[in-house]
C-alpha cells in the first residue's frame, strides 16, 4: 500500500475512474459496501475508527466482534457485522445477513441485540456474551424486551445457561455451580427495598457475594457497612435464610459453598412472614438514620 498521511473513512467525492485507479494503487481500500478507507487498517486505533464508520453506515457489530467489545478486548480484523442487505464480505469486514436486524446502541456503537448475536457464536462465547449483555439489576427485563417472539431451541438453552442479571464473575460462577447442583437461581432479587445477589427460586434463601474492594473502599465504605446490616436484618425478619460469602471463597472453596447451600435448603422455613412495611426498619436506613451515622 502506498503511504498515506491520513487514516480513516474516505468521505470525499471522486469519479469512478479515479476511485478505480486509487483502489488499484492501494491508496484507497474498499472495506465493505459503501465504505472506503484511506491509510492503514491494522492498528487498534484504525479498527476502532472502522467500528465507528460501520456504526455510521448502519452496520451492527455482532458475533466474535461483539463478544470482544463486551469483554473490553481489542476488536480484531475482520470485524463482524449484521445487516439486512445481501453484501459481499471482505478481508476487513464479515457481513452476516439477517432477515430482521434488531439493534441497540452500546457506548456509542451500534450492536446487534445480544440474544440475536449469539447465533453466530460457539456456546462458550455465546454464554459469556449473554452474561455481559444482560448483566445487572435490569438484565432480565432487558432480555425480555429484546427477545424475539420466537427463538431457536439452541438460543433458549444458551439463555438458560447464562447467569442473566448477575453483576460479577464470582456471582456467575456461583449461580452456575448451584444450577449444576439442581438449584435454580434468580440474580438481583428484590426483597423490600433491597436487592440480593442470588435468590434460590424454590427456597426462601438469599445469598450475597461480597467483593473485598466494594466493602472496604473508603469508609468499608461506612455507608455500605451500615446498609448491609439493616439489609440482612430486613430479610431475616421476613423469614429468609441469609447466606453471605466472600468472593475469594467462591474461587477457592466453591464446592464447600454449594454443600452449605444444599444443607440450608433442608432447614429453611417454608413460609415467609407478613411484615408491617410502614415500620421504618423496613425502609432503607438512608431514609431515616442521621447523616452523622453514615
Language-model features, listed with the residues they occupy:
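Short gly/ser-rich loop at a beta-strand->alpha-helix junction or flexible surface loop bordering the NTP-binding
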Residues: 1-151, 267, 273-294
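Surface segments flanking catalytic/ligand-binding clefts of nucleic-acid enzymes
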Residues: 134-294
Amino acid at each position: 500500500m502506498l503511504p498515506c498521511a491520513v487514516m480513516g473513512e474516505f468521505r470525499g467525492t471522486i469519479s469512478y475512474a479515479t476511485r478505480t485507479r486509487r483502489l488499484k494503487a492501494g491508496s484507497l481500500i474498499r472495506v465493505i459496501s459503501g465504505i472506503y478507507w484511506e491509510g492503514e487498517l491494522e492498528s487498534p486505533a484504525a479498527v476502532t475508527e472502522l467500528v465507528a464508520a460501520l456504526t455510521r453506515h448502519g452496520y451492527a457489530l455482532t458475533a466474535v466482534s461483539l463478544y470482544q467489545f463486551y469483554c473490553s478486548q481489542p476488536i480484531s480484523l475482520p470485524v463482524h457485522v449484521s445487516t439486512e442487505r445481501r453484501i459481499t464480505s471482505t478481508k476487513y469486514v464479515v457481513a452476516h445477513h439477517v432477515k430482521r436486524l434488531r439493534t441497540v446502541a452500546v457506548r456509542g456503537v451500534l450492536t446487534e441485540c445480544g440474544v440475536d448475536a449469539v447465533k453466530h457464536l460457539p456456546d462458550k462465547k455465546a454464554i459469556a456474551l449473554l452474561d455481559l449483555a444482560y448483566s445487572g439489576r435490569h438484565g432480565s427485563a432487558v432480555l425480555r424486551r429484546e427477545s424475539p417472539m420466537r427463538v431457536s431451541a439452541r438460543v433458549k438453552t444458551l439463555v438458560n445457561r447464562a447467569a442473566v442479571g448477575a453483576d460479577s464473575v464470582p456471582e456467575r460462577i456461583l449461580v452456575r455451580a448451584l444450577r449444576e447442583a439442581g438449584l435454580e437461581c434468580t440474580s438481583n432479587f428484590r426483597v423490600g427495598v433491597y436487592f440480593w445477589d442470588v435468590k434460590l427460586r424454590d427456597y426462601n434463601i438469599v445469598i450475597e457475594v461480597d467483593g473485598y474492594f466494594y466493602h472496604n473502599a473508603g469508609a468499608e465504605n461506612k455507608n455500605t457497612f451500615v446498609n448491609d446490616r439493616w439489609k440482612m436484618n430486613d430479610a431475616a425478619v421476613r423469614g429468609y435464610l441469609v447466606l453471605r460469602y466472600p468472593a475469594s471463597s467462591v474461587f477457592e472453596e466453591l464446592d464447600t459453598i454449594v454443600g452449605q447451600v444444599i444443607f440450608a435448603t433442608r432447614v429453611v422455613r417454608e413460609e415467609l412472614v407478613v411484615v408491617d412495611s410502614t415500620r421504618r426498619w423496613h425502609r432503607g436506613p438512608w431514609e431515616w438514620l442521621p447523616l452523622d451515622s453514615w
